[in-house]
Amino acid sequence: MVTLRFFKGLILSDSYAPGLKWSEELKAYAGLAYLYREVKEYFKESGVEVSDQVLDTLPLPPLRDSVRLRDYQREALDAWLKSGKRGVIVLPTGAGKTSVALKAIALLSVPTLIVVPTIDLMTQWASAIREKLGVEPGMVGGGRDEKKGITV
C-alpha cells in the first residue's frame, strides 16, 4: 500500500511514481501538487492500493440536474470531458458558460470550488446553483466564510 499526503504545495508518496523525486529533507518522494491526479492514476493502473490522505473533501448532497444545454454548449462540455476533464471552456459573453459548468458539476457530482473575481458574480453563481442544482452553496468572500460541498 502507498500513502499519498499533501504538504506545502507538494504531493508526498512513500513510493516512487513518475514526476516525483526523492526528498531527503521530507523523507518521501515529492512533486508539485498538480501531479496528484497522474500519481494517483499511476498507482491505480499499477494495481497498487492507495491510502489517500491528500484530500479531505466536504460532503456533497444529492444534486438535482435541471440544466438544459444548447447544442454548442453540449459540444463544449463533451470536448472538455474527452480531454480528461481538463481545460478551459471558451464561449462569448452571454453564451452560457455558467450553464456548461453547472452541467459538469451535476454530471461529476464531486465537491467543487468556483472562483470568481467579484461579489456580484459570487451572488449570481450561488443563485444559479440553488436554482439548477437544488442545493445551498457555501460562499467565501464579501464577509462570508461558509464552506460546503459546492462553494463559491
Name these PLM-found stretches:
Residues 1-75:
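Accessory DNA-engaging acidic/polar modules
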Residues 38, 100, 124-125:
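Phosphate- and divalent-cation-binding pockets in alpha/beta enzyme and binding domains
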Residues 73-84:
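Pre-Walker A (pre-P-loop) alpha-helix and adjacent loop at the N terminus of AAA/AAA+ ATPase modules
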Residues 83-108, 113:
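Walker A/P-loop
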Residues 114-115, 139:
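Structural beta-sheet core signal
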Residues 120-145:
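Conserved helix-turn-beta segment of the N-terminal RecA-like "Helicase ATP-binding" lobe
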Residues 147-152:
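Conserved two-lobed SF2 helicase motor
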